[in-house]
């Protein structure tokens, strides 16, 4: 829980997940720019899904998402492509590493509000280490395949969400829809349900990789379409 966490854990996660990405990008940027290469960062499904119990990790991956999106816009001017890989629950050493850090921290103070939960987590960590369970989850072959696509595909995506189960894909779509509806309700110029559907229909070919959007006439038509929505007067009503 965030209110019980020590800042050292946050610093550890940001050092690995955020500052590490920044340092490597800075170090290799000249070579990548010279060769017109590609940059692929490893984010996570937690870069846009947040929940109780992993807030610090999620915060670090949200930062990777923002860093990657901004870097992509900047490097585009230098003919360098940037993408993010967003794995779901695949086998890795993340959980094992976290367990080892928790058990090694013998000076950790008891939680004020969630001590029972902390003891349960520590017990599970001990059981896992005693049983010799190292990596849990689906083998990460699909993640490696996504990295290869981002590096070598002729028309790569800027984000590759890689999840082993349909339910994880459903979580991401549900979260995105929830955020769209929440954002739409925050201001006095919100759209009606029908208008939102029309906007989604307009964006659909672009999201599907329709290359007709590269056509100047099509782009002009789309600019006119969104300009019409941007300049409409008054608050929409059902």
Language model segments and positions:
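Residue(s) in the substrate-gating loop at a strand-loop-helix junction
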Residues: 44
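Substrate-binding pocket helix/loop in short-chain dehydrogenase/reductase
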Residues: 1-2, 6-11
């Amino acid at each position: 829980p965030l209110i019980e966490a020590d800042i050292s854990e946050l610093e550890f996660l940001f050092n690995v997940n955020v500052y590490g990405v920044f340092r490597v990008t800075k170090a290799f940027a000249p070579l990548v720019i010279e060769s017109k290469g590609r940059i692929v960062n490893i984010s996570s499904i937690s870069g846009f899904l947040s929940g109780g119990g992993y807030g610090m990790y999620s915060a670090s991956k949200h930062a990777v998402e923002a860093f990657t999106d901004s870097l992509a816009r900047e490097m585009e001017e230098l003919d360098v492509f940037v993408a993010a890989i967003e794995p779901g629950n695949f086998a890795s050493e993340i959980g094992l590493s976290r367990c080892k850090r928790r058990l090694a921290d013998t000076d950790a103070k008891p939680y004020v509000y969630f001590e029972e939960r902390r003891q349960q987590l520590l017990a599970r960590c001990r059981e896992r280490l005693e049983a010799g369970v190292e990596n849990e989850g689906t083998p990460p072959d699909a993640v490696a395949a996504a990295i290869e696509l981002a590096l070598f595909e002729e028309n790569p995506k800027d984000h590759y969400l890689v999840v082993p189960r349909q339910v994880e894909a459903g979580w991401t779509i549900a979260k995105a829809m929830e955020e769209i509806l929440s954002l739409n309700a925050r201001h006095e110029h919100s759209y009606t349900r029908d208008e939102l559907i029309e906007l989604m229909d307009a964006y659909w070919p672009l999201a599907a990789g329709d290359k007709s959007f590269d056509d100047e006439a099509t782009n002009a038509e789309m600019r006119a379409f969104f300009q019409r929505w941007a300049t409409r007067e008054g608050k929409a009503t059902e």
